């Protein structure tokens, strides 16, 4: 996401520290204001005894996963990157112990209309806090209940030095908000697929009556009211899986790429159609069918392509929605992405927002003084149907 103005900063490091500082100052002032308002209103019904809502899950519920030594016998195995070798050795492992749970999340007299399932990482505290305060607020929109969950693994190896602090911070969040689902697998790119699988299982067990689900990353901006307007004319018992449609995406064969998939994992020429993993919407009907289909589809290291494989297995197809933009909003002949709020007022979801951008956009779109002409509307999404790196 391009920055609104950065020419005054000669050093990227200086700019980064400046933006972080500004964000923290703004957040502090805003949170103090929000706290004063909540205190003046008195207890809020949705913040009910969260100590009883969250649950620290015992590790012994799932047997430990053991590496499959036969993977070493695959042709060319020793030439593969270490991360791909590990993926192949543990590809059969589909269930991991749950460290934090929120089983009563969907309990209550009112059914859940929309569940926001946000893929996050232990170190992304600032993103989670912004989402809680902006588009991810748990509330009722004209009687339609919206709830929120963050899907998290454990700190990856590069975060080992501060893993205890991140674990303590996540524990505080889980107890305070009751919105954290954490499993005991390393939170890496190749393990994003595990978050989808565990979410499907969790939903079936704890929230089977949810009408719709939004799966997204923690660096997206969601116009929640627009999402609800779209969903209110959909049926939860009909198939819905919509987002930025990717058709004809081919596997990346360069071993240095983040999206590298060798023939040992996928020998095919192109992936089945899927929606970019930055964000997509699905119905209760589709959640059930995906869960059943996933049992017959081997794990795959690219999470959104894996969902396309499960859809194909279930005999379903993804669809395109022009209001979901995983590649941002860009004006013609302009190099950087636009942050004009008028370009976002009719969209549902846009990918790649820094925390400070998320806060500013939320405030701008909810400013009663905002006036936009009919011409100030984002055009068609940028072509991404043939881009395998668009995730």
UniProtKB/Swiss-Prot annotation:
The chain crosses the membrane at residues 12-32. Its main location: Golgi. Its EC number is 2.4.1.147. It is found in: Golgi apparatus membrane. It is a single-pass type II membrane protein. GO terms for biological process: protein glycosylation. GO terms for molecular function: acetylgalactosaminyl-O-glycosyl-glycoprotein beta-1,3-N-acetylglucosaminyltransferase activity; galactosyltransferase activity. Keywords: Glycoprotein, Glycosyltransferase, Golgi apparatus, Membrane, Signal-anchor, Transferase, Transmembrane, Transmembrane helix. It catalyses: a 3-O-[N-acetyl-alpha-D-galactosaminyl]-L-threonyl-[protein] + UDP-N-acetyl-alpha-D-glucosamine = a 3-O-[N-acetyl-beta-D-glucosaminyl-(1->3)-N-acetyl-alpha-D-galactosaminyl]-L-threonyl-[protein] + UDP + H(+); a 3-O-[N-acetyl-alpha-D-galactosaminyl]-L-seryl-[protein] + UDP-N-acetyl-alpha-D-glucosamine = 3-O-[N-acetyl-beta-D-glucosaminyl-(1->3)-N-acetyl-alpha-D-galactosaminyl]-L-seryl-[protein] + UDP + H(+). It comes from the Eukaryota. Pathway: Protein modification; protein glycosylation. Glycans are attached at residues 68, 191. One of its GO terms (cellular component) is Golgi membrane. Residues 33-391 are lumenal. Belongs to the glycosyltransferase 31 family. PANTHER family: ACETYLGALACTOSAMINYL-O-GLYCOSYL-GLYCOPROTEIN BETA-1,3-N-ACETYLGLUCOSAMINYLTRANSFERASE, BETA-1,3-N-ACETYLGLUCOSAMINYLTRANSFERASE. Beta-1,3-N-acetylglucosaminyltransferase that synthesizes the core 3 structure of the O-glycan, an important precursor in the biosynthesis of mucin-type glycoproteins. Plays an important role in the synthesis of mucin-type O-glycans in digestive organs. This is Acetylgalactosaminyl-O-glycosyl-glycoprotein beta-1,3-N-acetylglucosaminyltransferase. The gene is B3gnt6.
